[in-house]
Amino acid sequence: MDRTPDHGEGEAAAAEGLTGTVVRGTALAGTGYALSQALTLAAYLVLARLVTPTEFGQFTAGMVLVALADLYTDSGMMSALVYRRDRVNEAAATAAIATVIGGFAVSLALLALAPLIGVFFGSTTIAGVAMAVSGMSLVRASGVVPDALLQRRFSFLRRTIVEPVSVLAFGITGVVLTANGLGVWGLVIAQYASMVVKTILSWGLVRWRPQLRLASYAMWRELISYGRHTIAATTVIRVGEEIPVLLLGRFTGAAPLGQFRYGRRIAALPLAMLMAAASYVLFPAFARIATEQERFHASVLRALRWMAILAIGGGLIMIPLGEPLTTLAFGPVWADAGKAAMALGVFAAARWVSSLIVETLKADGRPDVVTRMNVVEIVAGGAAMVALLPLGLVGVCIGVSIGAVVRAAYAFSRAHAVVGLPLTEMLDAIRAPVLAALAMVAILFPLETFVVQAGDQATATGLLLVALEATLGLAIYAGILHALVPGTLAEFRYLVGRMWKRSRPDGEMSDRPRMSPGLSATVRSG
Protein backbone atom coordinates (compact mmCIF):
# COMPACT_ATOMS: atom_id res chain seq x y z
CA MET A 1 0.00 0.00 0.00
CA ASP A 2 1.31 3.42 -0.92
CA ARG A 3 1.90 5.29 2.31
CA THR A 4 4.55 7.64 0.98
CA PRO A 5 3.80 11.28 1.81
CA ASP A 6 3.63 13.69 -1.08
CA HIS A 7 6.95 15.34 -0.30
CA GLY A 8 7.89 15.28 -3.96
CA GLU A 9 5.10 17.59 -4.94
CA GLY A 10 5.77 20.01 -2.11
CA GLU A 11 9.50 20.14 -2.79
CA ALA A 12 8.97 20.68 -6.51
CA ALA A 13 6.56 23.50 -5.87
CA ALA A 14 8.90 25.07 -3.34
CA ALA A 15 11.86 24.82 -5.69
CA GLU A 16 10.09 26.52 -8.56
CA GLY A 17 8.34 28.94 -6.31
CA LEU A 18 4.72 28.68 -5.29
CA THR A 19 4.11 32.26 -6.34
CA GLY A 20 5.24 31.42 -9.85
CA THR A 21 2.96 28.41 -9.94
CA VAL A 22 -0.01 30.46 -8.81
CA VAL A 23 0.72 33.33 -11.20
CA ARG A 24 1.05 30.97 -14.13
CA GLY A 25 -1.93 28.97 -12.94
CA THR A 26 -4.06 32.07 -12.71
CA ALA A 27 -3.07 32.99 -16.26
CA LEU A 28 -3.73 29.56 -17.74
CA ALA A 29 -6.77 28.67 -15.67
CA GLY A 30 -8.23 32.13 -16.12
CA THR A 31 -7.62 32.05 -19.86
CA GLY A 32 -9.19 28.63 -20.17
CA TYR A 33 -12.16 29.60 -18.07
CA ALA A 34 -12.56 32.87 -19.95
CA LEU A 35 -12.49 30.90 -23.20
CA SER A 36 -15.20 28.64 -21.80
CA GLN A 37 -17.27 31.67 -20.88
CA ALA A 38 -16.75 33.19 -24.33
CA LEU A 39 -17.92 29.97 -25.98
CA THR A 40 -20.86 29.77 -23.57
CA LEU A 41 -21.81 33.34 -24.38
CA ALA A 42 -21.65 32.58 -28.10
CA ALA A 43 -23.88 29.55 -27.61
CA TYR A 44 -26.38 31.50 -25.53
CA LEU A 45 -26.42 34.34 -28.06
CA VAL A 46 -27.62 31.86 -30.68
CA LEU A 47 -29.88 29.90 -28.32
CA ALA A 48 -31.59 33.13 -27.23
CA ARG A 49 -33.04 33.33 -30.72
CA LEU A 50 -33.99 29.65 -30.89
CA VAL A 51 -35.41 29.02 -27.40
CA THR A 52 -38.01 31.09 -25.56
CA PRO A 53 -37.64 32.36 -21.98
CA THR A 54 -40.38 29.90 -20.99
CA GLU A 55 -38.41 26.94 -22.37
CA PHE A 56 -35.26 28.10 -20.59
CA GLY A 57 -37.33 28.42 -17.43
CA GLN A 58 -38.64 24.87 -17.81
CA PHE A 59 -35.08 23.61 -18.24
CA THR A 60 -33.90 25.52 -15.15
CA ALA A 61 -36.81 24.26 -13.05
CA GLY A 62 -36.25 20.66 -14.15
CA MET A 63 -32.58 20.93 -13.13
CA VAL A 64 -33.41 22.36 -9.70
CA LEU A 65 -32.28 19.30 -7.71
CA VAL A 66 -29.39 18.19 -9.91
CA ALA A 67 -26.78 20.62 -8.56
CA LEU A 68 -27.78 19.87 -4.98
CA ALA A 69 -27.76 16.12 -5.61
CA ASP A 70 -24.29 16.28 -7.14
CA LEU A 71 -22.92 17.24 -3.73
CA TYR A 72 -23.87 13.83 -2.41
CA THR A 73 -22.47 12.21 -5.52
CA ASP A 74 -19.16 13.93 -4.82
CA SER A 75 -19.49 13.52 -1.03
CA GLY A 76 -16.76 16.12 -0.63
CA MET A 77 -14.28 13.74 -2.28
CA MET A 78 -12.85 16.35 -4.64
CA SER A 79 -11.83 18.73 -1.85
CA ALA A 80 -10.61 15.83 0.29
CA LEU A 81 -8.37 14.52 -2.51
CA VAL A 82 -6.92 17.96 -3.25
CA TYR A 83 -6.22 18.50 0.46
CA ARG A 84 -4.81 14.97 0.98
CA ARG A 85 -1.12 14.84 1.95
CA ASP A 86 -0.40 11.09 2.01
CA ARG A 87 -1.60 7.70 0.64
CA VAL A 88 -2.96 9.41 -2.43
CA ASN A 89 -3.35 6.25 -4.52
CA GLU A 90 -5.42 4.61 -1.81
CA ALA A 91 -7.54 7.72 -1.39
CA ALA A 92 -8.10 8.13 -5.14
CA ALA A 93 -9.10 4.48 -5.62
CA THR A 94 -11.52 4.68 -2.71
CA ALA A 95 -13.01 7.92 -3.97
CA ALA A 96 -13.44 6.50 -7.48
CA ILE A 97 -15.61 3.65 -6.19
CA ALA A 98 -17.53 5.79 -3.70
CA THR A 99 -18.43 8.50 -6.21
CA VAL A 100 -19.74 6.09 -8.85
CA ILE A 101 -21.87 4.25 -6.29
CA GLY A 102 -23.10 7.57 -4.96
CA GLY A 103 -23.87 8.83 -8.47
CA PHE A 104 -25.98 5.79 -9.26
CA ALA A 105 -27.93 6.07 -6.01
CA VAL A 106 -28.50 9.80 -6.45
CA SER A 107 -29.72 9.34 -10.03
CA LEU A 108 -32.32 6.84 -8.84
CA ALA A 109 -33.45 9.25 -6.12
CA LEU A 110 -33.80 12.11 -8.62
CA LEU A 111 -35.85 9.90 -10.91
CA ALA A 112 -38.21 9.09 -8.05
CA LEU A 113 -38.56 12.77 -7.06
CA ALA A 114 -39.20 14.05 -10.59
CA PRO A 115 -43.02 13.87 -10.40
CA LEU A 116 -42.98 15.95 -7.20
CA ILE A 117 -40.95 18.65 -8.94
CA GLY A 118 -43.60 18.77 -11.64
CA VAL A 119 -46.33 19.11 -9.02
CA PHE A 120 -44.48 21.93 -7.24
CA PHE A 121 -44.08 23.96 -10.42
CA GLY A 122 -47.47 22.90 -11.79
CA SER A 123 -46.05 21.60 -15.07
CA THR A 124 -45.93 18.13 -16.60
CA THR A 125 -43.19 19.35 -18.95
CA ILE A 126 -40.98 20.27 -16.01
CA ALA A 127 -41.66 16.84 -14.49
CA GLY A 128 -40.51 15.23 -17.74
CA VAL A 129 -37.36 17.35 -17.80
CA ALA A 130 -36.60 16.40 -14.20
CA MET A 131 -36.91 12.71 -15.10
CA ALA A 132 -34.70 13.14 -18.16
CA VAL A 133 -31.87 14.91 -16.30
CA SER A 134 -31.78 12.47 -13.37
CA GLY A 135 -28.96 10.46 -15.00
CA MET A 136 -26.62 13.46 -15.00
CA SER A 137 -25.48 12.71 -11.47
CA LEU A 138 -24.04 9.36 -12.54
CA VAL A 139 -22.25 10.93 -15.50
CA ARG A 140 -20.75 13.67 -13.34
CA ALA A 141 -19.73 11.19 -10.64
CA SER A 142 -17.54 9.37 -13.15
CA GLY A 143 -15.36 12.46 -13.57
CA VAL A 144 -14.91 13.59 -9.96
CA VAL A 145 -11.63 11.77 -9.25
CA PRO A 146 -9.75 12.70 -12.45
CA ASP A 147 -10.87 16.31 -11.97
CA ALA A 148 -9.52 16.30 -8.42
CA LEU A 149 -6.19 14.77 -9.46
CA LEU A 150 -5.71 17.32 -12.23
CA GLN A 151 -6.39 20.14 -9.76
CA ARG A 152 -4.13 18.60 -7.14
CA ARG A 153 -1.19 18.44 -9.55
CA PHE A 154 -1.58 22.07 -10.60
CA SER A 155 -2.31 20.74 -14.08
CA PHE A 156 -4.23 23.39 -15.97
CA LEU A 157 -5.33 21.09 -18.77
CA ARG A 158 -8.81 20.90 -17.30
CA ARG A 159 -9.30 24.65 -17.55
CA THR A 160 -7.52 25.15 -20.85
CA ILE A 161 -8.81 22.08 -22.72
CA VAL A 162 -11.54 20.13 -20.97
CA GLU A 163 -13.95 22.91 -20.12
CA PRO A 164 -13.78 24.79 -23.45
CA VAL A 165 -14.31 21.55 -25.40
CA SER A 166 -17.24 20.52 -23.19
CA VAL A 167 -18.82 23.94 -23.64
CA LEU A 168 -18.35 23.60 -27.39
CA ALA A 169 -20.14 20.25 -27.26
CA PHE A 170 -23.05 21.88 -25.42
CA GLY A 171 -23.24 24.77 -27.85
CA ILE A 172 -23.09 22.75 -31.06
CA THR A 173 -25.55 20.13 -29.83
CA GLY A 174 -27.95 22.68 -28.38
CA VAL A 175 -27.98 24.93 -31.43
CA VAL A 176 -28.47 22.06 -33.89
CA LEU A 177 -31.27 20.43 -31.90
CA THR A 178 -33.18 23.58 -30.93
CA ALA A 179 -32.91 24.86 -34.50
CA ASN A 180 -34.77 21.70 -35.47
CA GLY A 181 -37.57 22.41 -33.02
CA LEU A 182 -36.62 20.31 -29.99
CA GLY A 183 -36.86 23.27 -27.61
CA VAL A 184 -36.26 22.36 -23.98
CA TRP A 185 -35.37 18.77 -24.92
CA GLY A 186 -32.57 20.06 -27.11
CA LEU A 187 -31.14 21.79 -24.03
CA VAL A 188 -31.35 18.56 -22.02
CA ILE A 189 -29.50 16.54 -24.67
CA ALA A 190 -26.91 19.30 -25.05
CA GLN A 191 -26.23 19.24 -21.31
CA TYR A 192 -25.66 15.48 -21.45
CA ALA A 193 -23.31 15.90 -24.42
CA SER A 194 -21.26 18.45 -22.50
CA MET A 195 -20.97 16.28 -19.39
CA VAL A 196 -20.02 13.12 -21.29
CA VAL A 197 -17.31 14.93 -23.27
CA LYS A 198 -15.96 16.51 -20.08
CA THR A 199 -15.74 13.16 -18.30
CA ILE A 200 -14.04 11.39 -21.21
CA LEU A 201 -11.45 14.15 -21.62
CA SER A 202 -10.70 14.26 -17.88
CA TRP A 203 -9.92 10.55 -17.80
CA GLY A 204 -7.86 10.83 -20.96
CA LEU A 205 -5.72 13.69 -19.64
CA VAL A 206 -5.18 12.51 -16.08
CA ARG A 207 -3.15 9.45 -17.17
CA TRP A 208 -4.13 7.53 -14.07
CA ARG A 209 -6.26 4.44 -13.48
CA PRO A 210 -7.55 3.35 -10.08
CA GLN A 211 -6.08 0.28 -8.40
CA LEU A 212 -9.34 -0.92 -6.91
CA ARG A 213 -7.57 -3.33 -4.53
CA LEU A 214 -6.30 -0.27 -2.64
CA ALA A 215 -9.79 0.98 -1.84
CA SER A 216 -10.85 0.59 1.77
CA TYR A 217 -13.66 1.49 4.10
CA ALA A 218 -11.17 3.04 6.52
CA MET A 219 -9.91 5.40 3.83
CA TRP A 220 -13.48 6.28 2.87
CA ARG A 221 -14.10 7.31 6.47
CA GLU A 222 -10.98 9.50 6.43
CA LEU A 223 -12.09 11.21 3.23
CA ILE A 224 -15.60 11.72 4.52
CA SER A 225 -14.29 13.19 7.78
CA TYR A 226 -12.86 16.07 5.76
CA GLY A 227 -15.44 16.05 3.01
CA ARG A 228 -18.48 16.17 5.28
CA HIS A 229 -17.79 19.81 6.09
CA THR A 230 -17.51 20.61 2.41
CA ILE A 231 -20.81 18.79 1.79
CA ALA A 232 -22.54 20.66 4.59
CA ALA A 233 -21.20 24.03 3.47
CA THR A 234 -21.98 23.50 -0.18
CA THR A 235 -25.40 22.00 0.53
CA VAL A 236 -26.41 25.19 2.26
CA ILE A 237 -25.10 27.39 -0.54
CA ARG A 238 -26.76 25.25 -3.22
CA VAL A 239 -30.06 25.46 -1.37
CA GLY A 240 -29.59 29.21 -1.24
CA GLU A 241 -28.94 29.34 -4.98
CA GLU A 242 -32.13 27.42 -5.68
CA ILE A 243 -34.35 29.65 -3.52
CA PRO A 244 -34.80 32.24 -6.31
CA VAL A 245 -35.50 29.40 -8.75
CA LEU A 246 -38.20 28.01 -6.47
CA LEU A 247 -39.73 31.41 -5.73
CA LEU A 248 -39.77 32.63 -9.32
CA GLY A 249 -40.84 29.32 -10.81
CA ARG A 250 -43.63 28.80 -8.29
CA PHE A 251 -45.03 32.32 -7.98
CA THR A 252 -44.17 34.11 -11.24
CA GLY A 253 -43.89 31.36 -13.86
CA ALA A 254 -41.33 29.74 -16.15
CA ALA A 255 -40.65 32.83 -18.29
CA PRO A 256 -39.26 35.02 -15.43
CA LEU A 257 -37.25 32.00 -14.32
CA GLY A 258 -35.69 31.79 -17.78
CA GLN A 259 -34.91 35.51 -17.61
CA PHE A 260 -33.26 34.96 -14.23
CA ARG A 261 -31.04 32.19 -15.63
CA TYR A 262 -29.79 34.49 -18.37
CA GLY A 263 -29.39 37.44 -16.01
CA ARG A 264 -27.36 35.43 -13.53
CA ARG A 265 -25.04 34.20 -16.26
CA ILE A 266 -24.53 37.70 -17.67
CA ALA A 267 -23.76 39.17 -14.23
CA ALA A 268 -21.03 36.57 -13.73
CA LEU A 269 -19.34 37.10 -17.10
CA PRO A 270 -16.82 39.79 -16.01
CA LEU A 271 -15.59 37.54 -13.22
CA ALA A 272 -14.78 34.34 -15.11
CA MET A 273 -11.04 34.52 -14.40
CA LEU A 274 -11.65 35.11 -10.69
CA MET A 275 -13.68 31.93 -10.44
CA ALA A 276 -10.86 30.00 -12.05
CA ALA A 277 -8.27 31.48 -9.70
CA ALA A 278 -10.24 31.11 -6.47
CA SER A 279 -11.67 27.63 -6.96
CA TYR A 280 -8.91 25.96 -8.98
CA VAL A 281 -5.57 27.59 -8.21
CA LEU A 282 -5.66 29.32 -4.83
CA PHE A 283 -7.05 26.45 -2.73
CA PRO A 284 -4.25 23.96 -3.51
CA ALA A 285 -1.69 26.77 -3.32
CA PHE A 286 -2.91 27.97 0.08
CA ALA A 287 -3.15 24.39 1.34
CA ARG A 288 0.58 23.92 0.78
CA ILE A 289 1.63 26.93 2.88
CA ALA A 290 -1.13 26.91 5.52
CA THR A 291 1.32 25.72 8.19
CA GLU A 292 3.60 28.74 7.55
CA GLN A 293 1.42 31.36 9.21
CA GLU A 294 3.29 34.52 8.21
CA ARG A 295 3.62 33.46 4.59
CA PHE A 296 0.04 32.19 4.52
CA HIS A 297 -1.41 35.44 5.87
CA ALA A 298 0.64 37.60 3.51
CA SER A 299 -0.42 35.51 0.51
CA VAL A 300 -4.10 35.61 1.46
CA LEU A 301 -4.10 39.39 1.99
CA ARG A 302 -2.39 40.02 -1.32
CA ALA A 303 -4.82 37.72 -3.13
CA LEU A 304 -7.74 39.39 -1.36
CA ARG A 305 -6.62 42.83 -2.52
CA TRP A 306 -6.47 41.77 -6.16
CA MET A 307 -9.65 39.73 -5.92
CA ALA A 308 -11.40 42.83 -4.58
CA ILE A 309 -9.96 45.10 -7.29
CA LEU A 310 -11.14 42.82 -10.09
CA ALA A 311 -14.39 41.53 -8.57
CA ILE A 312 -15.83 44.78 -7.26
CA GLY A 313 -15.13 46.73 -10.42
CA GLY A 314 -16.27 43.88 -12.67
CA GLY A 315 -19.44 43.28 -10.69
CA LEU A 316 -20.62 46.84 -10.15
CA ILE A 317 -20.12 47.88 -13.77
CA MET A 318 -23.15 45.70 -14.54
CA ILE A 319 -25.39 48.14 -12.61
CA PRO A 320 -25.27 50.84 -15.31
CA LEU A 321 -24.53 48.59 -18.30
CA GLY A 322 -26.27 45.26 -17.61
CA GLU A 323 -29.64 46.13 -19.14
CA PRO A 324 -28.48 47.80 -22.39
CA LEU A 325 -25.86 45.09 -22.94
CA THR A 326 -28.39 42.27 -22.55
CA THR A 327 -31.08 43.92 -24.66
CA LEU A 328 -28.66 44.56 -27.51
CA ALA A 329 -26.89 41.20 -27.39
CA PHE A 330 -29.84 38.86 -26.87
CA GLY A 331 -32.76 40.85 -28.22
CA PRO A 332 -35.62 42.84 -26.67
CA VAL A 333 -37.38 39.66 -25.49
CA TRP A 334 -34.56 39.27 -22.93
CA ALA A 335 -34.76 42.83 -21.55
CA ASP A 336 -35.86 41.56 -18.14
CA ALA A 337 -32.69 39.45 -17.96
CA GLY A 338 -30.77 42.71 -18.28
CA LYS A 339 -32.60 44.15 -15.30
CA ALA A 340 -31.76 40.99 -13.38
CA ALA A 341 -28.08 41.38 -14.32
CA MET A 342 -28.12 44.94 -12.97
CA ALA A 343 -29.61 43.82 -9.68
CA LEU A 344 -27.11 40.95 -9.44
CA GLY A 345 -24.03 43.14 -9.97
CA VAL A 346 -23.51 43.58 -6.23
CA PHE A 347 -24.05 39.83 -5.72
CA ALA A 348 -21.27 38.99 -8.17
CA ALA A 349 -18.82 41.37 -6.53
CA ALA A 350 -19.56 40.29 -2.95
CA ARG A 351 -19.68 36.59 -3.75
CA TRP A 352 -16.31 36.42 -5.42
CA VAL A 353 -14.61 38.44 -2.70
CA SER A 354 -15.99 36.10 -0.05
CA SER A 355 -15.05 33.09 -2.20
CA LEU A 356 -11.41 33.82 -1.43
CA ILE A 357 -12.16 33.57 2.28
CA VAL A 358 -13.82 30.22 1.59
CA GLU A 359 -10.66 28.87 -0.06
CA THR A 360 -8.61 30.27 2.83
CA LEU A 361 -10.69 28.47 5.44
CA LYS A 362 -10.61 25.21 3.49
CA ALA A 363 -6.83 25.43 3.12
CA ASP A 364 -6.51 26.08 6.86
CA GLY A 365 -8.41 22.86 7.54
CA ARG A 366 -11.57 24.62 8.74
CA PRO A 367 -14.22 23.96 6.06
CA ASP A 368 -16.78 23.69 8.89
CA VAL A 369 -16.71 27.48 9.23
CA VAL A 370 -17.81 27.82 5.61
CA THR A 371 -21.07 26.11 6.51
CA ARG A 372 -21.93 28.86 8.98
CA MET A 373 -21.07 31.49 6.38
CA ASN A 374 -23.50 29.92 3.96
CA VAL A 375 -26.23 29.59 6.58
CA VAL A 376 -25.92 33.32 7.26
CA GLU A 377 -26.28 34.04 3.54
CA ILE A 378 -29.28 31.77 3.04
CA VAL A 379 -31.11 33.26 6.03
CA ALA A 380 -30.40 36.90 5.13
CA GLY A 381 -30.85 36.40 1.40
CA GLY A 382 -33.91 34.20 1.73
CA ALA A 383 -35.66 36.69 4.00
CA ALA A 384 -34.82 39.54 1.63
CA MET A 385 -36.05 37.60 -1.42
CA VAL A 386 -39.36 36.75 0.22
CA ALA A 387 -39.83 40.35 1.38
CA LEU A 388 -39.06 41.71 -2.10
CA LEU A 389 -41.00 39.04 -4.04
CA PRO A 390 -43.86 41.51 -4.79
CA LEU A 391 -41.33 43.39 -6.96
CA GLY A 392 -40.98 40.28 -9.11
CA LEU A 393 -37.74 39.28 -10.82
CA VAL A 394 -35.78 42.41 -9.87
CA GLY A 395 -36.88 42.20 -6.24
CA VAL A 396 -35.71 38.60 -5.96
CA CYS A 397 -32.35 39.52 -7.54
CA ILE A 398 -31.87 42.39 -5.08
CA GLY A 399 -32.55 39.91 -2.28
CA VAL A 400 -29.84 37.62 -3.68
CA SER A 401 -27.37 40.53 -3.62
CA ILE A 402 -28.28 41.41 -0.03
CA GLY A 403 -27.54 37.85 1.04
CA ALA A 404 -24.14 37.92 -0.67
CA VAL A 405 -23.14 41.18 1.05
CA VAL A 406 -24.11 39.82 4.48
CA ARG A 407 -22.13 36.65 3.74
CA ALA A 408 -19.04 38.65 2.81
CA ALA A 409 -19.23 40.68 6.03
CA TYR A 410 -19.56 37.52 8.11
CA ALA A 411 -16.71 35.89 6.16
CA PHE A 412 -14.36 38.70 7.13
CA SER A 413 -15.25 38.35 10.80
CA ARG A 414 -14.65 34.58 10.69
CA ALA A 415 -11.36 34.91 8.82
CA HIS A 416 -10.18 37.22 11.60
CA ALA A 417 -11.40 35.02 14.44
CA VAL A 418 -10.47 31.60 13.04
CA VAL A 419 -7.46 32.12 10.76
CA GLY A 420 -6.08 35.18 12.55
CA LEU A 421 -6.10 37.53 9.57
CA PRO A 422 -5.98 41.17 10.75
CA LEU A 423 -9.44 42.68 10.25
CA THR A 424 -8.08 46.17 9.57
CA GLU A 425 -5.82 44.85 6.81
CA MET A 426 -8.71 42.94 5.21
CA LEU A 427 -10.86 46.07 5.23
CA ASP A 428 -7.96 48.08 3.80
CA ALA A 429 -7.78 45.58 0.94
CA ILE A 430 -11.35 46.31 -0.18
CA ARG A 431 -11.77 49.97 0.80
CA ALA A 432 -10.21 51.54 -2.31
CA PRO A 433 -11.98 49.22 -4.79
CA VAL A 434 -15.35 49.90 -3.15
CA LEU A 435 -14.90 53.69 -3.27
CA ALA A 436 -13.62 53.59 -6.86
CA ALA A 437 -16.47 51.34 -8.01
CA LEU A 438 -19.14 53.51 -6.37
CA ALA A 439 -17.69 56.58 -8.09
CA MET A 440 -17.71 54.72 -11.41
CA VAL A 441 -21.38 53.76 -11.00
CA ALA A 442 -22.30 57.30 -9.91
CA ILE A 443 -20.93 58.63 -13.21
CA LEU A 444 -21.94 55.86 -15.62
CA PHE A 445 -25.51 55.26 -14.44
CA PRO A 446 -26.90 58.76 -15.15
CA LEU A 447 -24.77 58.96 -18.30
CA GLU A 448 -26.37 55.81 -19.72
CA THR A 449 -29.87 56.43 -18.37
CA PHE A 450 -30.32 60.07 -19.39
CA VAL A 451 -27.77 60.75 -22.13
CA VAL A 452 -26.46 57.76 -24.10
CA GLN A 453 -29.39 55.32 -23.84
CA ALA A 454 -27.45 52.65 -25.73
CA GLY A 455 -30.21 50.08 -25.34
CA ASP A 456 -32.51 52.13 -27.57
CA GLN A 457 -30.04 52.27 -30.47
CA ALA A 458 -29.54 49.89 -33.39
CA THR A 459 -27.63 46.76 -32.37
CA ALA A 460 -24.20 47.61 -33.80
CA THR A 461 -24.35 51.24 -32.70
CA GLY A 462 -25.64 50.34 -29.26
CA LEU A 463 -22.95 47.71 -28.62
CA LEU A 464 -20.28 50.20 -29.67
CA LEU A 465 -21.69 52.74 -27.24
CA VAL A 466 -21.77 50.17 -24.43
CA ALA A 467 -18.13 49.29 -25.17
CA LEU A 468 -17.17 52.97 -25.02
CA GLU A 469 -19.07 53.41 -21.75
CA ALA A 470 -17.35 50.35 -20.30
CA THR A 471 -13.97 51.73 -21.34
CA LEU A 472 -14.78 55.06 -19.72
CA GLY A 473 -15.99 53.32 -16.57
CA LEU A 474 -12.86 51.20 -16.25
CA ALA A 475 -10.69 54.28 -16.83
CA ILE A 476 -12.51 56.09 -14.03
CA TYR A 477 -12.16 53.04 -11.79
CA ALA A 478 -8.44 52.62 -12.50
CA GLY A 479 -7.75 56.33 -12.09
CA ILE A 480 -9.41 56.52 -8.68
CA LEU A 481 -7.65 53.33 -7.57
CA HIS A 482 -4.33 54.82 -8.57
CA ALA A 483 -5.11 58.01 -6.66
CA LEU A 484 -6.13 56.10 -3.52
CA VAL A 485 -3.41 53.43 -3.70
CA PRO A 486 -0.42 54.71 -5.70
CA GLY A 487 1.47 51.93 -7.43
CA THR A 488 -1.59 49.76 -8.10
CA LEU A 489 -1.39 50.16 -11.88
CA ALA A 490 2.34 49.49 -11.92
CA GLU A 491 1.86 46.31 -9.92
CA PHE A 492 -0.97 45.26 -12.23
CA ARG A 493 1.26 45.71 -15.28
CA TYR A 494 3.97 43.68 -13.56
CA LEU A 495 1.58 40.82 -12.77
CA VAL A 496 0.15 40.77 -16.29
CA GLY A 497 3.67 40.67 -17.71
CA ARG A 498 4.61 37.86 -15.38
CA MET A 499 1.49 35.88 -16.34
CA TRP A 500 2.30 36.37 -20.01
CA LYS A 501 5.91 35.26 -19.57
CA ARG A 502 4.98 32.18 -17.60
CA SER A 503 2.12 31.17 -19.90
CA ARG A 504 4.35 31.12 -23.01
CA PRO A 505 5.31 27.68 -24.36
CA ASP A 506 9.02 28.46 -23.83
CA GLY A 507 8.41 29.80 -20.33
CA GLU A 508 10.42 28.64 -17.38
CA MET A 509 7.73 26.35 -16.00
CA SER A 510 6.31 23.19 -17.50
CA ASP A 511 2.66 22.30 -17.51
CA ARG A 512 3.50 18.66 -17.05
CA PRO A 513 1.40 17.38 -14.12
CA ARG A 514 3.42 16.95 -10.96
CA MET A 515 2.61 13.59 -9.43
CA SER A 516 3.34 12.10 -6.08
CA PRO A 517 5.67 9.09 -6.13
CA GLY A 518 2.68 6.79 -5.66
CA LEU A 519 0.72 8.26 -8.52
CA SER A 520 3.76 8.19 -10.80
CA ALA A 521 4.23 4.52 -10.10
CA THR A 522 0.60 3.85 -10.83
CA VAL A 523 0.83 5.59 -14.19
CA ARG A 524 3.94 3.64 -15.15
CA SER A 525 2.38 0.32 -14.16
CA GLY A 526 -1.08 1.03 -15.49
What are these regions (language model features)?
Residues 2-7, 17-75, 98-114, 131, ...:
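Signature of the first transmembrane helix
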Residues 2-10, 97-122, 128-132, 172-176, ...:
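Alpha-helical transmembrane segments of multi-pass membrane transport and lipid-handling proteins
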Residues 1-12, 16, 416-417, 421-426, ...:
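Membrane-proximal transmembrane or re-entrant/amphipathic helices at the cytosolic face
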Residues 2-18, 22, 157, 200-242, ...:
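Interhelical loop/hinge segments that connect adjacent transmembrane helices in multipass membrane
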Residues 72-89, 151-152, 263, 267-311, ...:
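Helix-loop junctions and terminal segments of transmembrane helices
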Residues 25-40, 166, 187-194, 198, ...:
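Transmembrane helical elements of multi-pass membrane transporters/channels
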Residues 127-134, 162-208, 222, 226, ...:
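Hydrophobic alpha-helical transmembrane segments
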Residues 80-89, 139-163, 185, 206, ...:
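Membrane-interface junctions at transmembrane-helix termini in multi-pass inner-membrane proteins
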